[in-house]
């Protein structure tokens, strides 16, 4: 019985908690950081009225502005990022000392990952550049349903010309 508990504790320490923490860090970057309590107490009818006035021509800009109003990282984000950096530092440490060997691409990737995470803690976040002009793709409406056209659109298969004109 104690062997099972020991294995379960080792599994949690090695795999579960670091992956859960990494998932929390990754998911938290997409969520807005609430700076004051006034934002949380907005009535539901104002949200519904603003949703009805949305201009749908710039959906990408709306998604970015709604998802990231502030670019601050609060204390718990910093704590989670530091813990992930600590876990990655120990996990990516070389087991043996190389003898004047060139660094492998995997080691360079690990170093770049750690540098990126530490830069997220030390550098001030900047909002992404706003794209002023969006080019929309033109889709010609089809007059009648045809199975070959549907297959080519759904599966990406083109078996011949769509129109014989």
Swiss-Prot record:
Cross-referenced Pfam families: SecM (PF06558)
Say which domain of life the source belongs to.
Bacteria
Q: Which InterPro entries match?
A: SecM
Cleaved signal peptide residues? 1-37
Gene Ontology MF term list: translation regulator activity
For this record, the Gene Ontology CC terms, alphabetical, are: cytosol; periplasmic space
Q: Tell me where it mainly resides.
A: cytoplasm
Localized where?
Answer: Cytoplasm, Cytosol; Periplasm
Which keywords annotate this record? Cytoplasm, Periplasm, Signal
Family to which this protein belongs: Belongs to the SecM family.
- What is the purpose of this protein? Regulates secA expression by translational coupling of the secM secA operon. Translational pausing at a specific Pro residue 5 residues before the end of the protein may allow disruption of a mRNA repressor helix that normally suppresses secA translation initiation.
Q: Which HAMAP family match?
A: SecM
| Protein name in UniProt | Secretion monitor
Q: Which gene encodes it?
A: secM
